[in-house]
Structure formats: structure tokens, C-alpha cells
Amino acid sequence: MSTGTFVVSQPLNYRGGARVEPADASGTEKAFEPATGRVIATFTCSGEKEVNLAVQNAKAAFKIWSQKSGMERCRILLEAARIIREREDEIATMECINNGKSIFEARLDIDISWQCLEYYAGLAASMAGEHIQLPGGSFGYTRREPLGVCVGIGAWNYPFQIASWKSAPALACGNAMVFKPSPFTPVSALLLAEIYSEAGVPPGLFNVVQGGAATGQFLCQHPDVAKVSFTGSVPTGMKIMEMSAKGIKPVTLELGGKSPLIIFSDCDMNNAVKGALMANFLTQGQVCCNGTRVFVQKEILDKFTEEVVKQTQRIKIGDPLLEDTRMGPLINRPHLERVLGFVKVAKEQGAKVLCGGDIYVPEDPKLKDGYYMRPCVLTNCRDDMTCVKEEIFGPVMSILSFDTEAEVLERANDTTFGLAAGVFTRDIQRAHRVVAELQAGTCFINNYNVSPVELPFGGYKKSGFGRENGRVTIEYYSQLKTVCVEMGDVESAF
């Protein structure tokens, strides 16, 4: 498959183990190929009736799945992981077409996806409570049990990976899931649904409904939904939390960020420069945990900035399906214009553009209507600038200087966000001292934007709560039952 050739020809909802047209509608959406600007799908958004059918179907599957042993669930999840590995190129290609990221990155995303399924497959059989001895031979014990039907609402920057991150722990714990992808990237979640079915989950255990805000509202307010896990913006996350609260539903929120990356003068310069590029330009800068506020100690500011600009200008932009491309297009035209608008405001507020920040038109004529821009490096930035305070969600790096550790910590924490943070230094004591003070849920030392599935990922403050990945996520997809066992006579007050 090549850029500019794919068109969706099958239904984009998945219910009961098969692709289906929605039973009713709440509008229509168009999905684009960012590389070319072509419409690849016009699809119906799921209405309240379709959402209810998906939830009821998942509820029936839950009754079967939750009764399986952890080892039985483990074997099926391992089979799903094997199929993902086997179909990696196909899935990665679909991610490129619908999302715009390079095939190089997309393959890494799919690797992380199957690793996530393998990880939680291993934990499925380890779910256990504890035994507590009580006086007189009595005792208590706890049971960790599934919640029921969980809802996953995904973002458009990592469509397949986020669907995997949300569904793997949910299914490992014995739950069912109804998943709603972003309407910008509706395609690849269907591949995951088909893979789960092929691996042997009960029909309906992982259903997919398409749509925007109205569909999301139907899901969050459904009385048979036990939990909602959302990845996306802060304003939408607040609405989801409010809707879920009315049904006393627990939520996991992975929201936005404006993360600091602190470069001390004793850093390994080569690694720090690579870390800054990783912190700003993966997936065209459309990553919630990006370290877009790059604080550089004054002693190395000029040298660091020079190297960053040099490396940024070498980034190959173009057709995301070409092996040597390292930056594809942004997700859509309105978002491209929004990001360019941030660069314009930054210049008006006194920032200096050292490279990029403008539209890029590839030589290939089929790409002329794609949503490309050159990655941008800004200097002369101040903490009160819009480009430093607000999440841009594009390939725009803001470089700021600092003098002391105490100063940079105060400035780094001066934000309503708290998703991630990073530090580059050779001083191991300083590294641990600094991350202990950073108000962020995910911190990196001498690296940035790596995602081992063994480690929990999530934020502080307005970046949300709950976690994706790691053993702790089992607790967010299960509930604890306490059982008290009396081995003697009842001591009655009456």
C-alpha cells in the first residue's frame, strides 16, 4: 500500500465480533489522510441506540470472560500479542495513513502495543487478594474483582497504541471494553478488535463505536458502564469527569502537558541534544508529555542551541511511508493553522525563530495538499509568553535559559500541568534531587519520551490522574472485596 491509495470500504463500528453499521446516528464525520489531504472515510457517528447495543453486547461478553481463570485470559492475550507482531507492518502502515506519523515511528508504536498485551497477559493470572489473621482463629481475606464494562476514549496521536494501553489491563482483569477512537483516526482500532476476536475473546468483549462528543456523552452517561478511561485535552477531560461523576464512575484521565526539560551545564551534550529532539519532535510534536519548555543553563546555552538547530534542520520531512522520513504531516488543516498561529504569536511577543515554523511543501505532487510544516526552534523566550505557557501540540521547541537549580525548579513547576519532566546531568545526586522536586507524574533522567510498558505513566495536577501501564494499573481496572470470616460464636450487643 502506498500514500494516496487507501480508502475505507468497510463499516467502522465493531460489535459482537464483527464490523457493523451503527443502529442509529448522531452525525457524520470525515477522516483524512494527513499526507495528501484526501478524505479516506465518511462515516456515521454512533447514536444512543448504537452505544447501548455496544454496551449490552459487552455486558454479555463480560459474564463469560470474567468467569475464565487468569491463565485462560493470559493465553488469549498472548495470542493477540502474537498476531499483532505478525501483522506489524500492516498495522503500522494504517497508522501512517490515518495519523501521518513516519513508518519508522509507527512500527515502534506497534511494538509497544504488543509488548503491552504480553505484559498484562503475564499479570492476568497474578491477580490476588490477601489473607488477614484475626483474633480467636477468625480471619479475613480480600478478593480483587473486575469492574464490568469499561469505556476507553482514545486520542488521535497514538490510535492503536492507546487502544492497546487501555484494553490490555482492562481485559487482563476480566473486564469488557467499549472503545471510542478519535473521529480523526477511526481506522486502526478496528484492527485491534479483529485481532482480539481472532485470538479467542468472547464476541462483544471489545467493541468499537465511532463518533465525536455526542457519542462520548452517551458512553459516559450509560448506567451499565463501570469505568471511563480517557486520553485527550484538559477541557474534554473535565467534561468526562463531570459526566462520569453523576453515575459515580471512576475515571482515568491522561490529559495535556507543558512539560519542562532541564539541561544542566554538566550534561552529556550529544545526549542532551538528542533528548531535546525526542522531547519535541516525535509524531510531529503531537505528544502530550513533550518537554516543550527546554531550560538550558546559561554556560552552555549558545552551544546547545547551535547543536539543536543543526540537528533540527536535518530532520527529513515528507511521505510518512518512506523509510527515511522522520517527520510526516500534522493531523489536519485546522490543527496545522493553529500551530502556525502559535509561532506567529511567539514572534509578536519577542521570541526569535531560529529555524522552521513555516509550511513545508514536499516535492512529490501528490503530497502538495498535505499538512506539513518545518520543525521550529524558538529562543529569546520568557516564562510569560503564550508559547511557553500553553500546550501547542506541534513541532515547536521553546528554549529558555537559567542560572541556578533552585531558580529552574521554581520556574519548571510554575504551570497548571504536571504530566512529565526531564533532566540531563552527569551529577547523579542532582538528578535525583531535582526529579524529587519536580511536580510531574512521569520524570526522565538523561532520556526523554521512552515508554516501557512496565512503568506507570500519568500526570499530576491538571494533567490528570490514574495511570496507564505498569502493575499499578491493575488497581484501576479492578475493585477490592473484603470478606470477614467468623470461626467462633457471634458476640451480640442484644
From Swiss-Prot:
Biological process terms in GO annotation: aldehyde metabolic process; carnitine biosynthetic process; protein homotetramerization
Q: Which domain of life is it from?
A: Eukaryota
Q: Which family does it belong to?
A: Belongs to the aldehyde dehydrogenase family.
Q: What is its main location?
A: cytoplasm
Residues annotated as catalytic: E254, C288
What's its job? Converts gamma-trimethylaminobutyraldehyde into gamma-butyrobetaine with high efficiency (in vitro). Can catalyze the irreversible oxidation of a broad range of aldehydes to the corresponding acids in an NAD-dependent reaction, but with low efficiency. Catalyzes the oxidation of aldehydes arising from biogenic amines and polyamines.
Q: Which GO terms describe its cellular component?
A: cytoplasm; cytosol; extracellular exosome; mitochondrion
Q: Quick one: which residues bind NAD(+)?
A: K180, G232, S233, V234, P235, T236, E391
Q: Spell out which residues are annotated as carrying N-acetylserine.
A: S2
Annotated InterPro entries: Ald_DH/histidinol_DH, Ald_DH_C, Ald_DH_CS_CYS, Ald_DH_CS_GLU, Ald_DH_N, Aldehyde_DH_dom
How does the annotation summarize its subunit structure?
Homotetramer.
User: What does the record give as the reaction this protein catalyses?
Assistant: 4-(trimethylamino)butanal + NAD(+) + H2O = 4-(trimethylamino)butanoate + NADH + 2 H(+); an aldehyde + NAD(+) + H2O = a carboxylate + NADH + 2 H(+); 4-aminobutanal + NAD(+) + H2O = 4-aminobutanoate + NADH + 2 H(+); formaldehyde + NAD(+) + H2O = formate + NADH + 2 H(+)
Q: Where are residues bearing N6-acetyllysine located in the sequence?
A: K30, K298, K303, K344
Gene3D superfamilies, alphabetically?
A: Aldehyde Dehydrogenase, Chain A, domain 1, Aldehyde Dehydrogenase, Chain A, domain 2
Instruction: Spell out the SUPFAM superfamilies in the cross-references.
Output: ALDH-like
Keyword NAD listed = yes
Q: Which CDD domains match?
A: ALDH_F9_TMBADH
How does the record characterize pH dependence? Optimum pH is about 9.4 with propionaldehyde as substrate, and 7.5 with 4-aminobutyraldehyde as substrate.
The EC designation for this entry is 1.2.1.47, 1.2.1.3, 1.2.1.46, 1.2.1.19
Where is this protein found? Cytoplasm, Cytosol; Cytoplasm
Q: Which UniProt keywords apply?
A: Acetylation, Cytoplasm, NAD, Oxidoreductase
What protein is this chain from?
4-trimethylaminobutyraldehyde dehydrogenase
Q: In which pathway does it act?
A: Amine and polyamine biosynthesis; carnitine biosynthesis
Q: Where is this site: Transition state stabilizer?
A: N157
Gene Ontology MF, one: 4-trimethylammoniobutyraldehyde dehydrogenase activity
